[in-house]
Amino acid sequence: MTVSAEIAYEIDAPYVQPHAREVYAEQPVFDTEELPPHVVFTPYLRALAKEIVGDETNALLKARKIYDFITTQAVYRFMPPYLTVPNIPEYFLSGLRGDCGVQAITFVTLCRLCGVPAQWQSGLYTKPNSAGHHDWARFYVAPFGWLFADCSFGGSAYRAGDLDRWNFYFGNLEPWRMPTCSAFQQEFNPPRRFLRHDPYDNQSGEVESLTRRLYADEYEDDCRVVRYEEME
């Protein structure tokens, strides 16, 4: 049996360059709560956040300090299934090794711990000739609204010595994105009957029958960019 779907969407990705001097003293408090079992303000994370941020009170600069820490200290590594990890940020920070999703949820957790609203996003990195899975984060600073942080791509740029690209990925994304998930560890709609392969991240969905879930080696999936055009 073959199941297919074609999705059309538009992406507006204006470049922003927020300045700390323009940040409001009063900031919102939404999306600053814990979300167990991974977005949890443990004693270790509280101590680390204090070490990273110090006495900084400017929301934009707090987020930048967290971004700088992750992108300059950590490197990309493939991960075991998230389902097997008790606490993703602590796992990542214990060795400063992890994939794009681990880096994103660590950024979200540290931002929230420091009072900066932050959310998870994941989906596809869709260049005109290819499409692949990717995760990133976004954070909210008034008066600018939602800004992006791609710690994985930013860290890669930093290690390559491309500081312009490193700075770009704090606040911005290029237009090669198709977000499919804007919340971490959320249920599908309609909900799954059986245990998910990954109950936290979702980039391309999962498969189940009426009687059981299907494992990755039991089906094939293929994602392609059919057409890409610049809009006026």
Descriptions of predicted regions:
Residues 171-232:
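Low-complexity, Gly/Ser/Thr/Pro-rich intrinsically disordered linker/tail segments
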Residues 82, 162-164, 212, 216:
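A subset of signal/propeptide-processing and intrinsically disordered low-complexity segments
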Residues 83-84, 124:
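Residue-level "edge-of-site" marker
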Residues 78-79, 119:
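A local structural micro-motif
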Residues 1-77, 84-90, 94:
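Acidic low-complexity segments
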Residues 62-66, 96-111:
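Active-site nucleophilic cysteine motif
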Residues 1, 92, 96-99, 103, ...:
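Secondary-structure capping and boundary motifs in well-ordered enzyme cores
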Residues 102-192:
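Hydrophobic/aromatic-rich core segments of domains that either
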